[in-house]
């Protein structure tokens, strides 16, 4: 695919991010010098809140030095007295300051505000995310064009290939973390965001489960659900496969009901059942290493179902789209397709070809609204 070969080729080299090809697990130290310790409101004019999470809030704002240039400002909640910079914020800054790819969100600025002692990260503003775009189609009873689906998924894979080539696992891929740029020179360009759960991995791999449960449950891979202690880049590929299917149908592929998320040790039986109802029950022939997972014996009490993926997604089993999707959501993570292999899949070589601008003209989607459709001022 001619429009993207250059970016795909550069991803294997590791231009700075993620510790490089040697598998190092550290970044250069983060030093918040006096240049960062400026009143954030002196540099940016805040409009309204556009998102929130356990980390804090995200605001739409204008850069005072660059008129009409929109930015997104991520405001971290205060930590307990004396704790200083949160570990989540530290990790996100450490990763993003060294990663550079057209499909990864760009960190523009860091401010440690002297007034409220809070940390602010400033990014390029993305008008859309896949959560909102999918919701628009679902509520309107419409579907994405084949070209848009292919362009979006290619760009997500391109960004993840870059991360994986630089020893980074995102660990929280879901539609709301896949941003898409609006009008401008990068219109229709995917930007993978929210690196609060991203981690460096090493080769040979070390256990990563000590960081707790990751990945929103609908996009959580079976090895995580069954208690794997040594998960890999394949968890990101599973999540992308779930997003791929959701773009095709505008509905989540595995919408399980989560038990108390505050108790990470809970076995999420409803989520596992949702997967089994679509892919069938995994067997030892299908996934030999499943017998080593802490929760695998729980599967014996679950009902068996035939594989109904093609029917659930509504695509031909003989199509290249189905072939790619089925390889992204294989039970066995060691057999799951890699990001590099996926980018080279025949699906992306048949018409329509993926494009840098995933949107048709004019863009049909409404602009991002304030939370609760009410203006949320910065000082609220």
UniProtKB/Swiss-Prot annotation:
Cofactor needs: Mg(2+)
GO cellular component, one term: nucleus
Gene Ontology BP terms: aggregation involved in sorocarp development; G1/S transition of mitotic cell cycle; positive regulation of gene expression; protein phosphorylation; protein stabilization; regulation of aggregation involved in sorocarp development; sorocarp spore cell differentiation
GO molecular function list: ATP binding; cyclin-dependent protein serine/threonine kinase activity; cyclin-dependent protein serine/threonine kinase regulator activity; protein serine kinase activity; protein serine/threonine kinase activity; RNA polymerase II CTD heptapeptide repeat kinase activity
Biased composition (Low complexity): 1-10
Enzyme class: transferase
UniProt cross-references to InterPro entries, sorted A to Z: CDK, Kinase-like_dom_sf, Prot_kinase_dom, Protein_kinase_ATP_BS, Ser/Thr_kinase_AS
Annotated EC: 2.7.11.22, 2.7.11.23
Protein name: Probable cyclin-dependent kinase 8
Organism (species): Dictyostelium discoideum
